[in-house]
Amino acid sequence: MSNAKITELGTQSIRSLLLKYAMPGIIAMTAMSLYNMVDSIFIGHGVGALALSGLTVAKPFMDICAAFGTLVGVGASSLVAIKLGEKDYRSANDILANVILLNVLLGAIIMVVGLYWLDPILYAFGASNETIVYAHEYMEIILWGNIITHIYYGLNSMLRSIGHPRISMYATILAVSLNVVLDPIFIFVMDMGVRGAALATIISQIVSVIVEMIIFLNPKEVIHFHRGIWRLRRDITMRALGIGLAPFLMHMAACFVVIVLNNQLKRYGGDMAIATFGMTNRFMFFFAMIVMGIQQGMQPIVGYNYGANLKDRMIRAFKLSVYCATCVMGILWLFGVVWPEGFIRLFTHDEVLIAQSIAPARIMLCVMFAIGFPMITGNFYTSIGMASKAIFLSLTRQVLYLIPLILCLPLLFELIGCAPIWGVWWALPISDSLSVITAAIVINRDMKKFKN
């Protein structure tokens, strides 16, 4: 990418920049979320409700693996955007090499540890004797391909930060499209069940990594692979991991919450309650991924203008991103309140499961119209290197609010004569509401400082 293209982040209108940088991310994230939904749809209809529950149990383990990729990828890409704003291209190239080296190292460690303790981990995450076989079969394949997964996400983040959001989008769409083609072949034609779904995921990521590598092997790029950069640098590693710590902790906290939630659901509602959460969460994830696409578009704009000391442009990019995210999550809220049965039937034809899922889905989605704001706010702080505040916002919702509510509300509901499972469901929207209030207080104070 040329210097002129990098500089556009500080000169072009915020609206056009956000459209240019966010739209590829939105398309890519929408495609990725569709892949996650299609994966669950094939498993739900092709294998059964218990397999769907097993996949829900495995999801926090997958998210933990992804969290370590986020620790490197998001942190390094934010640092690259800042370095580009400072015109420090040599450091930006060193960061690129460190992304590869760190992802290989962390990916290998997680693979070995995960495979060795796979069943105990899955039982701790909420698996039952009926669902453990499905969760094990799926995660075993995913873990063998964990290094590829880490590199895939790391390079995808770097592509967006160096001004190639479209190529990042194409790489993601390629992975998604290939996965959607391979899923029915492996699950139905070859009768591989959940193993087939996992194998399709890894194969599609391998192909996308090859595409990403081709871009970074081009010497005409300002940021590219070349000799002299292939060494771990302590300063880059610590800085990148420090910036990436916020989204990492957010992902880890979310994983821990799902683990606690799965166990509470299994305790009060059984495997079918876990399946209910899994279906609703996958549908909610579709819209959340669109917001993540907006975050991806905002990140290089905010990071560059912060590094270039163009605070007014930075603030305008943040506000426009919040507006867009709120509109997206508002659509989810309308869908969840008006017709939850519609999306539930996408995942299963089990009439008992469908009937028991409608009311919990409405509860979980009842305040979704407001949740885009804290999502954008946390990413904003990550983009400008203020990791501590991003960490605070993510941990207040996930740890300070949600976990105590998940544990205490079922007991309270039981005391007043209601089924305790409803306390688990209501913990989610209450925590979301508190997180919106907290984010508003924090960002309001800092916006006054930035304007001054």
Report residues per predicted region.
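N-terminal transmembrane alpha-helices
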Residues: L9-V47, P60-G75, L79, K83, ...
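Short alpha-helical transmembrane segments in multi-pass integral membrane proteins
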Residues: M1-A22, V80-I147, D191-L245, V302-V367, ...
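Hydrophobic transmembrane alpha-helices of multi-pass small-molecule transporters
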Residues: I64-A67, N179-P184, V209-M213, F285-M289, ...
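Small-residue-rich hydrophobic transmembrane alpha-helices
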Residues: L52-V112, T149-S168, T276-P340, I371-A390
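Short runs within selected transmembrane alpha-helices of multi-pass transporters and secretion channels
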Residues: I142-R160, S168-V176, A197-I210, V291-Q295, ...
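Helix-terminus/linker motif at the lipid-water interface of multi-pass membrane proteins
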Residues: L34-S53, L122-N129, I185-M192, C255-R282, ...
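Small-residue hotspots at the loop-to-helix junctions and early N-terminal turns
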Residues: A49-P60, M139, A198, D271-F286, ...
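Transmembrane helical elements of multi-pass membrane transporters/channels
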Residues: K20-D39, I141, A175, S204-S208, ...
